[in-house]
Amino acid sequence: MNDNIIEQGVAAAAESSLDHSILNAAHIAADDAAIVADAASIISDSESLETEAEQAEVEQKPNGFVELGLAPELVQAVADLGYTQPTAVQAKAIPLAMNKGPNATAFVDLMVSSQTGSGKTAAFLLPVLHTLLEQQAEIEAEGRAEFERACAEAAANGEPAPKRKRKDPTNPRNFKAAAPGALILCPTRELAQQVAHDAIELVKHCRGLRVANVVGGIPYQLQIAKLQNANLVVATPGRLLDLQRSMQIKLDKVQFLVVDEADRMLDLGFSDDLAEVNQMTSQRQQTMMFSATFASRIQQLAMRVMHDNGAGVKKIQIDSPQEKHSSIKQVLFWADNAQHKRKL
């Protein structure tokens, strides 16, 4: 009898102890959840305030691309993409590339060291497209002036006014090899396609400015058709030289040469191709080279392709800032004992 009472007492004590353990564990779990919720709330509020402050600061600033002196068509295209302020590399490279310095008398060669994601593509596309727009406007103005002179002469002689001649580009008789004013070389097909896509986005408000992409893996006839009247060509070296050797493209009118990711270009063995393109575009006014670093081999390449062996080249080096990823959710878990660590 007494033994039964003792056993029942022990069982009751054990059950009571177990109940307290469960309650304590529940309280601990609830406390952990509250701590995590508070931490997440603090992080979320902090990120929200930071984002709102950044947006307010951007809204107060005038459009930075306007201040860089870019053509209105390009500024509008950039705004359509959601950008009103240039990145560090854009703010430094664009004025130099556009020959906008206070004492600038000619285009200067540029070497730019900037990491992927810094906005480097727009840093060379925007000034090149801006200059092509200016040149196109000059050509169109000369054409209008010549037509007006012809009309005046016809009127003076009592003859009917001449008609503007428009060639049908689809007619094989009107075919002529492409002669772009600007050439951008990329080490890989994927990069060339991305750069060409970005260029097309930027020229959507630019009447008459055409972009062509020349890469391997695309049928020749399709690329040849797209090359017609192209002002800017984005290419990989191999396919570009193939089309040049078959007389589908001429490089003697190239005024601006950009070598993107020059370090990868050398890694992939395009040194000889670069030398060949360099020789074919010797008449160009400007060369820009973009690379992740200014390693010695990049310096040597610059000496081979820049004017005056790189003596007058301007160098821009942008340090990579600490990245912010606002889309990543941060959660804090306190792990002060074995039970909590098992939850992780």
Regions found by a protein language model. Give the residues of each.
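N-terminal intrinsically disordered, low-complexity tails of helicases
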Residues: M1-V108, A141-P172, P187, G208, ...
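Motif I (Walker A/P-loop) of helicase-class P-loop NTPases
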Residues: V89, I94, M98, K120-L132, ...
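Residue-level signature of catalytic and energy-coupling elements of molecular machines
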Residues: V78, Q90, V112, V128, ...
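Interdomain coupling/hinge region of P-loop NTPase helicase/AAA+ cores
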Residues: E134, L183-L185, L202, V211-A212, ...
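Walker A/P-loop
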Residues: A104-V128
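Conserved nucleic-acid-binding Ia/Ib motif block in the N-terminal RecA-like helicase ATPase lobe
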Residues: A79-Y83, E138-R245, K253-F256, K315
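Pre-Walker A (Motif I) flank of P-loop NTPase domains
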Residues: G101-V112, A179-A182, A230-N231, Q285
